[in-house]
Amino acid sequence: MQIAQFYTDAFFSDCEKLGIKRPEIVVPATSCIDTFIHMVEVLLEKGYAYIAGGNVYFDTSKLENYYVFGNMEEESLAVGVRDSVEEDENKRSKSDFVLWFTKSKFDDQELKWDSPWGVGYPGWHIECSGISIKYLGEYLDIHCGGIDNAFPHHTNEIAQSEAYLGHPWCKYWFHVLHLLDARGKMSKSKGDFLTVSLLEEKGYAPLVYRMFCLQSHYRKPLTFSFESLDNTATAYKKLVSRIAALKNEGEHDEAAMEPLRASFRAALENDLNTSLALTALYDVLKAQLSDADKLALIKEFDEVLSLGLLKAAKALREEQNAQKSAVPEGMTAEEAAEIEALIAKRTEARKAKDWATADAIRDALAARHIVVKDTPQGITWSVQG
């Protein structure tokens, strides 16, 4: 359970950094075991499940339309999802799936519970259906996930949920296509995947990655490269800079704002076209509106895009004001920035033990009467004489 809590905490920490809201209800599957057992019992009573080899299986032959997402024919399906998955001889059909395990290939399974069929644990699919039905009710509007969840996971969720409930379960399914790199699909199993901490280590703000994702439609595969992310980082920085330059003043013109709102709304209503929504955001900056109205629209739009634009713009203004106040008398902001850059370069040279470069920069600063001091709070500098 400590391992599960570690990854739960890490997940929600990453979500916060990426501008993803935390769900109002967060429950571990281990707290819903009674719900899963009840669902399996009902499926057995209704004839949608059978017991074999100590396990309880869902009988997909009892459904007229099991392959609900289309483009999948029984004859063309390989046994299991991955090549490493062995055929289960207890199944009546290769498309059947486990609702409750008492025996499995995982001999070291630690978490097990008593059930009418013996000590065991729930199948992967029944967990998602059970938690959803328990906390969200018998009807869902939207269910989302990656495209690789469409089959078998979401297909099996639909099968067991509608068999259990006796009516349609979910109105809309939302599947996001894969993130790719130059070699193809990125995945944990291949050992080539991104983490938020890795991006941060490389100097990228998580919200820059969010903007990178929003630039593409969810129905299209997204090809990742650090070059592309660099371009997005530059675009994000420029966008924030333009917003930071706006002043919350000017006349209000609701009639002029409404077409821009309509454009943003139309983009989202067009199958959640976030790329067009970003275009609508940029249109606000180009529009003939007061700065106050522009800021109001940006706030509205960013409640959806969640790019932290106003917060980043405020931080940039504060940084710019601090830099202005820190410029010594008689020196321009450009000159002060040049000195800061030289000091940063000297620091990197010292870390790399490039003493020649470090000494050359020190001499250049001294020639300009710049005194550099190392303090516990960091490096400071001043003009002497």
Language model features by range: what are they?
Residues 1-19, 372-377, 381:
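N-terminal, positively charged nucleic-acid-binding surface of large information/translation enzymes
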Residues 31, 123-127, 272, 276-279:
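Aromatic- and histidine-enriched alpha-helix N-cap/loop-to-helix transition segments
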Residues 24-26, 142, 372, 381:
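Generic structural signal for residues in well-ordered beta-strands
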Residues 2-3, 120, 273, 338:
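Conserved acidic
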Residues 6-13, 18, 22, 33-245:
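Alpha-helical recognition segments enriched in aromatics with Gly/Pro capping
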Residues 185-188, 193-385:
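Structural preference for alpha-helix termini/caps and helix-kink/transition segments
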Residues 1, 24-30, 118:
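The substrate-binding groove and active-site-proximal loops of carbohydrate-active enzymes
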